[in-house]
């Protein structure tokens, strides 16, 4: 990220204070980026970016960190974010790609791709927790950004709802693991199912708990192993697949999609 200008915001200023302070400094298009699924041992990693319009048009009733909302509240807020956002993008990285590239590399690449896919180019970027390099606009990594910046909270909800819907679909495809309940995170139920059934193709074989029960020393099934590991820079050169709004509606992303050919949806009020 480029070095951001100095901006002072009151800690108790509310969810929209940081964006409004930046907008007063002349940054009208402030994008937030966040992810869902970093800590899960099954299912995809999902990153999202969102720009909310300035003023009252960008205020989303009930918007908060997705982890603080009930599933019903998340669905309602998700629909309102989609309706109000000036631009939004969601990128889905399959478990196989997380195993191949590594979690942190995929996480940064996914957020970078989501930001680059916004129909409205951002003038300033806020990210949750850590910075994303390779951006040509100033930005700021905000600790618990999904609780202090509205655009980051909006991205958090987009990523979380998209991923949860995918996990419900995976539960139908791979019954017995409880994906619809725990969404691929480590729980007592999930751990018991792993021990009893072994991992399925949607598990992340690079994770210790999955590798331990797989009996394959962490190697994924042959059907999931790519013949050639392409160079990381290919992830950045390849274009984003456009128009796959179905991902947000619960449809499965295309099998085997990589970071370089990721599944994305785009939209916004324009």
From Swiss-Prot:
The keyword Translocase does not apply. It comes from the Bacteria. It catalyses: Endonucleolytic cleavage to 5'-phosphomonoester. Pfam families: RNase_HII. Gene3D superfamilies: Ribonuclease H-like superfamily/Ribonuclease H. This is Ribonuclease HII. Residues 28-222 form the RNase H type-2 domain. Its cofactor is Mn(2+); Mg(2+). InterPro entries: RNase_HII (IPR022898), RNase_HII/HIII (IPR001352), RNase_HII/HIII_dom (IPR024567), RNaseH-like_sf (IPR012337), RNaseH_sf (IPR036397). It is found in: Cytoplasm. Manganese or magnesium. Binds 1 divalent metal ion per monomer in the absence of substrate. May bind a second metal ion after substrate binding. Its main location: cytoplasm. Endonuclease that specifically degrades the RNA of RNA-DNA hybrids. GO terms for cellular component: cytoplasm; ribonuclease H2 complex. Its EC number is 3.1.26.4. Keywords: Cytoplasm, Endonuclease, Hydrolase, Manganese, Metal-binding, Nuclease. A divalent metal cation binds at residues 34-35, 128. One of its GO terms (biological process) is mismatch repair.
């Amino acid at each position: 990220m480029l070095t951001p200008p100095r901006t002072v915001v009151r800690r108790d200023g509310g969810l929209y204070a940081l964006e409004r302070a930046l907008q007063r400094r002349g940054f009208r298009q402030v994008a937030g980026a966040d992810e869902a699924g970093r800590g899960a041992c099954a299912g995809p990693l999902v990153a999202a970016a969102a720009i909310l319009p300035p003023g009252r048009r960008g205020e989303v009733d009930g918007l908060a960190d997705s982890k603080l909302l009930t599933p019903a509240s998340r669905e309602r807020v998700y629909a309102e974010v989609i309706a109000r956002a000036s631009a939004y993008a969601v990128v889905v990285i399959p478990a196989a790609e997380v195993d191949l590239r590594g979690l942190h590399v995929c996480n940064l690449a996914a957020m970078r791709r989501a930001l680059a896919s916004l129909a409205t180019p951002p003038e300033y970027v806020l990210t949750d927790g850590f910075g994303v390099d390779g951006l040509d606009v100033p930005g700021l990594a905000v600790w618990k950004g999904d609780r202090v910046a509205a655009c980051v909270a909006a991205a958090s909800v987009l990523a979380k709802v998209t991923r949860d819907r995918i996990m419900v679909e995976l539960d139908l495809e791979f019954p017995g693991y409880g994906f619809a309940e725990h969404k691929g995170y480590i729980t007592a139920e999930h751990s018991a199912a792993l021990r009893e059934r072994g991992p399925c193709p949607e598990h992340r074989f690079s994770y210790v708990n999955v590798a331990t029960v797989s009996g394959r020393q962490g190697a994924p099934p042959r059907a999931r192993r790519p013949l050639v590991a392409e160079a990381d820079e290919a992830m950045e050169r390849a274009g984003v697949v456009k128009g796959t709004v179905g991902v947000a509606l619960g449809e499965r992303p295309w099998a085997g999609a990589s970071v370089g050919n990721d599944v994305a949806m785009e939209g916004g009020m324009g």
